[in-house]
Amino acid sequence: MSEAAPRVGPRPEFGPSLPAWLRARFGVPPLVTLGVVAVVALVAAVAIVITLSSPSAPGKQVVHPSPPVFNLLYPPALMHRVAARPGELMRIEGHRGKLTTEIVVRPLKLPAYKGDVTHGLLPVYADRFADAQAKLLPGFLLTSEGRARVNNGVGYELVFQSVRPARRVYGRDVLLVPDDITEGKGLVILSLRQTKPGGPFTKAEQPLAYQSKKAYRSFRFGTSRG
């Protein structure tokens, strides 16, 4: 007895194929249907490749070319570079609603130290830095601290807040040392401040709050984006 040939095509319980259904219902030739499906599949595949390979909008790059050398990206629709104040290397600000954000870079000068700076000296220096911030911000509360990496820099980060009925301040300060001292040519203090009078961020303020954190995290030593 010969074996039955295997069934080719859709099983009966699944109904007719798409080309057969379109031909029976609307008179569309099967070759036309298959051609349209192939084009749609190709467009979808290209869209997936673009999504996976294209980076998100990077923002505007700003470079500090003299030591310490660094650059970062910021969203020009929400933030803008302003003149640095005394003791600062760079200042970027944004305003939306009642929210004000600031990203500030300052030079970091440490005493001579023979050991591992990031493990030995920075935590001690960070404690003193936190004490200084506590004197400036009433209601200062240190919410977290520890070693941190920001792209090609490693250091120690302090995260804190000062919440009062009339004013809220959320801050981050990271003391950064470049992986390659010849690239960064110096150490920095990278700071983020988000300040508004009372209440949590509104829906209109949330994009600035989010994008300012991304800009803070975009910091890199050197002039390239890696």
Roles of regions detected by a PLM:
Residues 1-22:
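N-terminal intrinsically disordered, acidic low-complexity segments at the extreme N-terminus
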Residues 57-62, 86-91, 151-161:
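Short, hydrophobic/aromatic-rich segments at coil-to-beta transitions
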Residues 21-26, 50-71:
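Ser/Thr/Pro/Gly-rich low-complexity linker/stalk segments immediately outside membranes or between
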Residues 135-143:
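A short, amphipathic edge element
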Residues 124-136:
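Short, solvent-exposed helix-to-loop capping segments enriched in aromatics
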Residues 35, 146-226:
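Short, well-structured beta-strand
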Residues 69-127, 161, 167-169:
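Secretory pathway targeting signatures of secreted, lumenal, and periplasmic proteins
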Residues 25-53:
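Hydrophobic membrane-insertion alpha-helices, especially the h-region
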